[in-house]
């Protein structure tokens, strides 16, 4: 059975509410944006891995907020990267930590920009990130 456009619109409207006292639109459903992503990885080795990838033809720059934990140790950083189709430039700032839990690098492999992460310890380390991409 095909779902009509009017049904889809009615389904969307039932999850939207306008609060006139605060002038805010509230939703009861999470919306998806192709430029935003949230992810999580847990690693038990010091091998480098791709924390995230994206198509370099579609996006020019990315910003990540990464929060890591290993037992009672914590490490948070903000990462910005930009590429020219061949080379990726990366910078970290806003680093807050009580221990260095990982290092980061970036490169281009095939059609993708890769944010590479190397955990500092083979002890179970969890890396969570929020990503925002900017179109090319």
Regions found by a protein language model. Name each.
Residues 95-136:
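Low-complexity intrinsically disordered segments
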Residues 16, 30, 77-83, 104-106:
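Broad, structure-driven detector of short, well-ordered beta-strand segments within folded domains
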Residues 68-70, 83, 133-135:
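Beta-strand elements of well-folded, non-transmembrane domains
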Residues 80-100:
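Terminal beta-strand-rich extracellular "head" domains
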Residues 25-27, 51, 90, 110-118:
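Generic recognition of long tandem-repeat/solenoid scaffolds
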Residues 3-53, 132-136:
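Glycine-rich, low-complexity segments
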Residues 37-60, 69-73, 87, 98, ...:
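Surface-exposed ligand/attachment interfaces on beta-rich extracellular proteins
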């Amino acid at each position: 059975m095909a779902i009509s456009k009017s049904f889809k619109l009615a389904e969307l409207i039932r999850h939207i509410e306008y609060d006139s006292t605060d002038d805010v639109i509230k939703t009861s459903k999470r919306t998806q944006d192709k430029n935003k992503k949230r992810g999580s990885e847990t690693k038990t080795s010091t091998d480098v891995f791709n924390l995230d990838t994206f198509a370099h033809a579609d996006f020019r720059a990315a910003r990540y907020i990464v929060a890591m934990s290993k037992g009672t140790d914590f490490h948070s950083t903000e990462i910005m990267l930009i590429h020219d189709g061949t080379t990726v430039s990366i910078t970290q700032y806003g680093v807050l930590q009580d221990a260095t839990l990982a290092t980061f690098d970036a490169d281009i492999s095939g059609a993708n920009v890769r944010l590479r992460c190397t955990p500092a310890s083979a002890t179970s380390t969890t890396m969570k990130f929020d990503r925002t991409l900017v179109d090319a």
